[in-house]
Amino acid sequence: MKKLIAVISISALFLTGCGSSDASTVNQGASEFAQTVTDPSVVILDVRTPGEFSSGHLANAINIDVEGMQFNSEVSKLDKTKTYAVYCRSGRRSVIATDEMQKLGFTKLFNLEGGTGAWSAAGQTLVTN
């Protein structure tokens, strides 16, 4: 019995130590992300280039290019207590952006899996204003 308890205790300790470091980013498909961005308290962050942004973006999105020289300084100006819905064209850059945002202290992050490609394929619209 003591052996069993020891094995369970060690296993629990090991599994706890293997928790995801990405716990504060929730990856969502287009339909889930569409629900998330309807909440007016959520900040929608487009991390594509300004040119990509101007060709079509989610309504009410702000644009900070993750590959731009000023990404960290611009993101650092944002309120870390708010919830952010982050997207790009394919989902690759938004993962990079949410990783950087976590390092800066952001904890409430949602990532659009598949980016605007998945968004459009799901019948969701982009705006150009």
Give residue spans per PLM region.
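Rhodanese-like catalytic fold shared by cysteine-dependent sulfurtransferases
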Residues: 2-7, 13-42, 51-83, 92-129
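Structural scaffold elements adjacent to functional motifs in cytosolic proteins
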Residues: 44-46
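Short cysteine clusters
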Residues: 88
